[in-house]
């Protein structure tokens, strides 16, 4: 199923509910101005679940950001149990105002997806990486390299959505999921990757280069 509509489908039930509430308020309440409240909620929900087009840059070895947000940490010699070799890790914090649709950082085949239940600490805390609810997507590239993305729920975000499955072939910049309301994404890249971002830098999903190898 495609996920290229302007509004992410996960937001449709909320938009319908608020929209119907607005109509009921207009037609059945004497003080119809009250309809402004659900109307505002409807418009905010449309904005929150926006799913804009992105233009992914060219470059065979380029790894792009999986999320809109701010780079909050970079580790250039990291070990993770799901990866066979040491790696570099870039952590990105998404606030409630960012686009929440996530995109594939590099083309390849999804070899493993691992969901872990957990807590809902603020996603900008380092311990959220290990303690919060999270979903790891491991992709093997055509030349055998491993690139992994982990979706991490935050203090408010309590719904991780992942649209891809194991054995799926994915393309860099393709939409693969979303997390509602402020969260964190971490990208694990081959250790030899040249990191192209710095801590504090703002990035866009599917467009901003994170690294190249």
Swiss-Prot record:
What GO molecular function annotations does the UniProt record carry, in alphabetical order?
phosphatidylserine decarboxylase activity
Q: Which keywords has UniProt assigned to this entry?
A: Cell membrane, Decarboxylase, Lipid biosynthesis, Lipid metabolism, Lyase, Membrane, Phospholipid biosynthesis, Phospholipid metabolism, Pyruvate, Zymogen
Localization per record: Cell membrane
Coiled-coil-forming residues are none
- The keyword Zinc is annotated on this UniProt entry: no
Modified residue annotations for Pyruvic acid (Ser): 183
PANTHER family assigned to the protein according to its UniProt record, in alphabetical order: ARCHAETIDYLSERINE DECARBOXYLASE PROENZYME-RELATED
Q: What is this protein called?
A: Phosphatidylserine decarboxylase proenzyme
Species: Syntrophus aciditrophicus (strain SB)
Instruction: Name the lineage.
Output: Bacteria, Pseudomonadati, Thermodesulfobacteriota, Syntrophia, Syntrophales
Per the record, the gene is psd
């Amino acid at each position: 199923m495609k996920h290229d509509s302007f509004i992410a489908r996960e937001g449709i039930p909320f938009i319908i509910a608020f929209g119907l509430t607005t109509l009921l308020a207009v037609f059945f309440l004497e003080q119809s101005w009250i309809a402004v409240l659900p109307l505002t909620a409807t418009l905010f929900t449309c904005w929150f679940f926006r799913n804009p087009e992105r233009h992914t840059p060219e470059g065979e070895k380029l790894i792009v950001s999986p999320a809109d947000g701010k780079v909050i940490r970079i580790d250039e010699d990291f070990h993770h149990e799901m990866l066979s070799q040491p790696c570099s890790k870039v952590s990105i914090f998404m606030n409630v105002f960012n686009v929440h649709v996530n995109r594939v950082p590099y083309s390849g085949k999804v070899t493993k997806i691992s969901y872990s239940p957990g807590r809902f600490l603020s996603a900008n805390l380092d311990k959220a990486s290990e303690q919060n609810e999270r979903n790891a997507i491991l992709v093997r590239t055509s030349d055998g390299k491993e690139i992994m993305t982990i979706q991490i729920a935050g203090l408010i975000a309590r719904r991780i959505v992942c649209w891809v499955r194991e054995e799926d072939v994915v393309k860099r910049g393709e939409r693969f999921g979303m997390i509602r309301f402020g969260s964190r994404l971490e990208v694990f890249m081959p250790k030899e990757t040249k990191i192209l971002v710095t801590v504090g830098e703002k990035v866009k999903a599917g467009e901003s280069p994170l690294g190249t190898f």
